[in-house]
Every structure is written in structure tokens, then in C-alpha cells.
Amino acid sequence: QYVIVAADSDVTTADDLKNKTIGSQLGTTGMFLSEDIEGVTAQTYNRAIDAVNDLVNGRVDAVIIDKNPAEVFNTKFEGKVKIIDGAEFGFETEEYAIALPKGSELVDQINQALEDLKADGTFDALVAQYIGE
């Protein structure tokens, strides 16, 4: 998880998030994390871009979101926002996985498909389409 704040924000620690308004996408880890911070007003959104737009427009103080979309939004809103690794706030690292039965013959095929998606630009195009809109 990453925290996105306004470029001029003084938020740098977990204590700085207390009693703030924090945006997150509905049903995500960011939503659950924000609900656990003391005094926070949690604002949820159907789309992450809406949370970040509200941040840029001063309606929320921070957005808690996954690393990849945070990096996309940092580029999209360059100079208006900054991103901070959630480890600075005590958030645990979260990874993605595809679960398969042990010894599955699909492992090599799935790994190759993922490599191909990255190599031919499909992965980046999907990120831009669904995260960076």
C-alpha cells in the first residue's frame, strides 16, 4: 500500500494521518486500513481516480492505494501529488498471486503469458486503461 498526498502536504507518518479525511477505493485494503486509523473520516469511492481527484481538489487529505496505481497517479498528477511507501506508516507489504494446485502443469504457461504481456506492452496498456483513466 502507498499513501498519496498533496505535493505540499506535511503528512509523513502514521500519526499525521490521525483525524484526517482519507480517500480509498471501495472494498480495497486501503479502505480497511483507513478505517483503522484513529479519528479518520473515511471517504470511499467506486474508482480510485475519483479519490485522487478529490485529493487534488482539497476534499480529502490523503489516499491509501496499491503501489502500481499510486505510481500511475503520481505521474498523471505530477507536481500536484507525492507518493509515500506505506511502510513509512507501518502498513504491511501486499503482493499479488495466482493460486494453483501444487505441481500444476499450468505454472509454466501462466508465467510465460505474464512475461509476454509485459514484453509486448499489453500489461502497461491495461494499467493505463483501467488504473490511469
Stretch-by-stretch model annotation:
Residues 9-10, 26-29, 43-57, 68:
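Short helix-initiation/N-cap motifs at beta->coil->alpha
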Residues 15-16, 36-37, 49-72, 76:
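Short helices/loops that flank or line small-molecule/ion binding pockets
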Residues 41-48, 81-85:
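Short hydrophobic/aromatic-enriched beta-strand-loop microsegments
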Residues 1-32, 39-42, 104:
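A conserved helix-loop-strand patch within extracytoplasmic ligand-binding domains
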Residues 11, 20-21, 26-28, 95-133:
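Extended ligand-binding regions for polar small-molecule ligands
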Residues 7, 26, 38, 59, ...:
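Sec/Tat-exported extracytoplasmic proteins
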Residues 1-5, 71, 75-115, 133:
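Periplasmic-binding protein-like
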